[in-house]
Amino acid sequence: MDPVQIRSLSLEALAYLGDAVWELHVRTRVLLPPRRLQWLHGDTVACVRASAQAKLATCLSPHLTVEEADWLRRGRNAGGTVPRRLDPATYRLATAFEALLGYLFLADRDRLGVILHLCDEFQHHHGPDTPSPEA
């Protein structure tokens, strides 16, 4: 997709795509070592929840290019209805993270790989997130 087409997409559409990119990446990552399905699901949920994504968005910030930081900022400022169970700031950062991944998936797969690797390293060393009581 060319840059003009990417810029024509809504931030919500990029976040929609980025959500799928992140979910598939995490599902692939947790497959090894082989474990029971319930553990795979639990590990995946811990990594893809909004609070974990918001944490990643914050940690990625120093590693982003100017253009990527702009996509993250735009994603954070995008409109949308915040689910009642979530803090608005957390939801907006998670949406920003997803929008950035959606943008990179369309614009630069090599850079997407670098960003996903940084996310993996961060979650490996710091854990995905503290599970919420509702989960």
From Swiss-Prot:
Its main location: cytoplasm. GO terms for biological process: rRNA processing. It is found in: Cytoplasm. It holds the Pfam family Ribonuclease_3. Its cofactor is Mg(2+). The active site is at residue 19. Keywords: Cytoplasm, Endonuclease, Hydrolase, Magnesium, Nuclease, Ribosome biogenesis, RNA-binding, rRNA processing, rRNA-binding. Its EC number is 3.1.26.-. Disulfide bonds: none annotated. One of its GO terms (cellular component) is cytoplasm. GO terms for molecular function: ribonuclease III activity; rRNA binding. Homodimer. PANTHER family: MINI-RIBONUCLEASE 3. Involved in correct processing of both the 5' and 3' ends of 23S rRNA precursor. Processes 30S rRNA precursor transcript even in absence of ribonuclease 3 (Rnc); Rnc processes 30S rRNA into smaller rRNA precursors. HAMAP family: RNase_Mini_III. Belongs to the MrnC RNase family. This is Mini-ribonuclease 3. The gene is mrnC.
